[in-house]
Amino acid sequence: MGVYYLLFGKLLSEGTLARLGISASLSPAQKDRLSRHFRFYQLLPPKSKALFEYRVAKFIRMKEFVPRNMTHVTEEMQVLIAASAIQLTFGYPKVFLSYSRYVIVFPDQFFSNAGQRYPKGEVNPKAKAIVLSWKHLVEGYSKSDGVNLGLHEMAHALQLENIVMNDEYDFLD
């Protein structure tokens, strides 16, 4: 039996998605990372997991991940950052934070020229970027104190997305 995705209310196979020109799927290793490290994904029913995987893969494909003060952004980083965005936008059918073209990843807190400070994350509208400290993103998902950098910064990106005139404009009341 093949893998199926729930898309626009219909259950579609990977083959159907490919014929439609939609080729967003996660590798087994990427799915494993979600299963091991992402509680929201773990709690989803199977059909919703398939849709979540599709949306994570599409988010990764749509963004340029840029390393700062590190050699590269790993696949694990891409998957968990994308999962943060999709967790927040999962109830919206076509919201992928498209205004933010770049995801800039630092290993730890960084100096922000825009804010002249050392934040853990920010959304920089001028650079069209979501900027994150990897260390603090991971801490946000491992602690139970209610502080989650990934969701916090993706919420800023979502707010910006609602303001900018593009295909994802004006979806919030």
How does the language model describe each region?
Residues 134:
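Conserved binding/catalytic microenvironments
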Residues 160-173:
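Post-HExxH zinc-binding segment in Zn-dependent metallohydrolases
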